[in-house]
Amino acid sequence: MDKLADLNYTLSVITLMNDTLHSIIEDPGMAYFPYIASVLTVLFALHIASIPTMKIALKASKCSYKVIKYCIVTIINTLLKLAGYKEQVTTKDEIEQQMDRIVKEMRRQLEMIDKLTTREIEQVELLKRIHDNLITRPVDVIDMSKEFNQKNIKTLDEWESGKNPYEPSEVTASM
């Protein structure tokens, strides 16, 4: 356990790995070697760092499977972010939670559509009744006795003194 957390041991293993890679690949023109070495270095460092963390986590918690799964998912997501990917690895629990949230949202939207559809049907029925009430029906004789503006109409002959009482007369005012 002490060797795993020792920085000198880690650096010597990294140096050994780089020397081994240099001896295997002797082509000096290989352009991707620094990238491969960097990825392998990061993987080795994560491996060295994750072993003590896993041992402590397993001893401290009772649910070892979930802790290991969470650690592995976190490590993979970190590697994906380092590589420049925007995608992430999710566990089945997270997928189920997201699916439950999506199903709830779809149910809420379906209920809203149902309410709106019911309201629209009611509005169409109301508009139909209003339209039916506004349709003009041809009538042969119109009874004008019930019209308010047709009561008590006097003609020019029926007015007193033959003058229209509603026409203005000339008024002079003193100044």
Swiss-Prot record:
Query: What sections of the protein cross the membrane?
Result: 29-51
Q: Does the keyword Hydrolase apply?
A: no
How is it placed in the membrane, per its record? Single-pass type III membrane protein
Q: For Ca(2+), which residues are the binding ones?
A: 120, 123
Q: Name one GO cellular component term.
A: host cell rough endoplasmic reticulum membrane
> Pfam families attached here?
Rota_NSP4
Residues on the membrane's Cytoplasmic side span 52-175
GO process terms (BP):
monoatomic ion transmembrane transport; symbiont-mediated activation of host autophagy; viral process
> Sugar-bearing residues?
8, 18
Q: Which top-level group of life is the source organism from?
A: Viruses
Places the protein is found: Host rough endoplasmic reticulum membrane; Host membrane, Host caveola; Secreted
The record's keywords, sorted A to Z, are: Activation of host autophagy by virus, Calcium, Enterotoxin, Glycoprotein, Host endoplasmic reticulum, Host membrane, Host-virus interaction, Ion channel, Ion transport, Membrane, Metal-binding, Secreted, Signal-anchor, Toxin, Transmembrane, Transmembrane helix, Transport, Viral ion channel, Virulence
Q: How is it modified after translation?
A: The N-glycosyl content is primarily Man(9)GlcNAc, with a small amount of Man(8)GlcNAc.
Per the record's keyword annotation, is Amino-acid biosynthesis included, yes or no? no
Task: Please list the residue ranges that the record places on the Lumenal side of the membrane.
Answer: 1-28
Task: Return the Gene3D superfamilies for the record.
Answer: 1.20.5.430
Q: Which GO terms label this protein's molecular function in UniProt?
A: channel activity; metal ion binding; toxin activity
InterPro entries the UniProt entry points to? Rotavirus_NSP4
Q: Which family does it belong to?
A: Belongs to the rotavirus NSP4 family.
Indicate the quaternary assembly: Homotetramer. Interacts with the immature particle in the viroplasm. Interacts with host CAV1, early and late in infection. Interacts with host integrin ITGA1/ITGB1 heterodimer. Interacts with host integrin ITGA2/ITGB1 heterodimer. Interaction with microtubules blocks trafficking to the Golgi apparatus.
Q: Copy the domain comment.
A: Binds 1 calcium ion per tetramer.
Protein purpose: Plays an essential role in the virus replication cycle by acting as a viroporin. Creates a pore in the host endoplasmic reticulum and as a consequence releases Ca(2+) in the cytoplasm of infected cell. In turn, high levels of cytoplasmic calcium trigger membrane trafficking and transport of viral ER-associated proteins to viroplasms, sites of viral genome replication and immature particle assembly.
Per its record, how is this protein called by name? Non-structural glycoprotein 4
